[in-house]
Amino acid sequence: MSLVIGLDTGGTYTDAALLDVDRGVVLATGKALTTRDDLSVGLGGAIAKVLADFDGAPEEIKMLPLSTTLATNAVVEGVGGRVGLFLIGFDEAALERADLARALGQDPVYFINGGHRPDGGIQAPLDIAALDAAAHKLKSEVSAFAVAGHFATRNPLHETETRDLLRDITGLPITCSHELSSSLGGPRRALTAVLNARLINLLERLITATQNIMAQQGLTCPLMVVKGDGSLLQADFALSRPVETVLSGPAASLSGAAFLAGAKSALIADIGGTTTDIAFLHNGTPRLKKDAAFVGGWQTMVEAAEIRTCGLGGDSEVAPILRGRTGGLTLGPRRATPLSLLALRWPSLKDHLSRQLDLAVPMATDARFVFPIMPDGVPQWLTRSEIRLAEKAIAAGPSPVAELAATQLALGAVDRLISRGLLGLSSFTPTDAAHVTGAFTEFDDEAAMLGAKLMARQRNGAGIAIAASPLDLAEMTLDELHRRSALALMDAALAHEGGGEAAVSSNPLLAQSFRKIPASNDQLVSVGVKLNTDLIALGASAATHYPPIANTVGV
């Protein structure tokens, strides 16, 4: 009997399963809430539940494969450490290719003379003096470096020389683009290197926490990490190339869905807390795409299963549209801890919500809370104002945004700390909406209802409340999730068949056909598209959300 424990850490839940590989039988399962401030708590809870139902000794476990959506979620949400990018032999025009400028955001970039020609010969000498000056300036301002050289896949010398100099001066993690891909396309290699550098600290926290729990439980088996193509990496190697795990969780889900459903051809949608991952089965297996993992709008140079990931999930942040006369809601791509869930950990949340509801005038920060995720303390590469705010957040614990940040400048700092993964956000989400409608009742119904009341009374540009009641607000939220999910499925299907990106959602006529039409509406024209394959939905909230989504796409 060959036994393995499969472990998956998502944005909301951590799951474990004990499997007899020889017989293909699941012997025990365990589920715990993912604890983002200390991942070992959720990991330990899930593994402990599995081992409690296992009669054998821990030494009988032969392997522990770990998959995670944390890297996927971080890329989709734009969360991660501050990265310094060195572009060697490129000019500023490189930033306009592969969406590199958008990926960098406010992170620093330096253009260094050097690089190579297509034949591998030196294009220009490497500017060591400029590198040295930049390294000393940035060593206390960033968490990691990314290095991309002109034609580095033909000759990586300037990338490796830059890496060695940065390592000697700063001691920080460094990602070279030629180590991640042998393909041409410098800006896309640079993009992939930036994403990799941002994810290093995140994956290190996860792997270290898992190794500590394994040691506590007496598990001596190898720890492996699932790659985006479904294969396995040794944990130590994964630490140097975390971008390889960017579709780890979706790849594991796809493999599991194919095994359980036994389908030969189908569209698979895995809805989690942060993302929906969409893939296609052909002859029972997914298709691999070399250098083409598509995650949250970024086309990377990572080999992975053909999976498309979008920022739609049960925990997507819901925000009111306050400008204009029509109002409405936006959804995602940022994840927020549901109010109904945070209330279980922090019961005084409901007191804060009630006090906000007692105010005569609604505030934009109503029903919005933050909590610190800084187990190693405040990073010193933050700005002075960000450091002060981070220290205040650690001292306060979970807090209303309005109490932590009383000015627009402070609110901007809060947003930056959230985007760096140092503060967690809690606000109204589709999970809360499902509590209000009664479709899901696992967490705190009262907190969800208070949040819905606060959201419903927010006013649009005409001074009109965006929803007539908490129930209307909840139904608006779920309708938007279902509409956007249906569009994502159809966009993925048409892209899979060569129809281009966003073929449905960018077409006003087709996109309009996915809106929920009131029963009283007398339409003169009806337009629609239909999915012509089986749909397999999985994920914690699939049973709640996918019946209406399937109906929308005609399955």
Task: Show which residues each predicted segment covers.
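N-terminally biased helix-coil "hinge/interface" segments that flank
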Residues: M1-V555
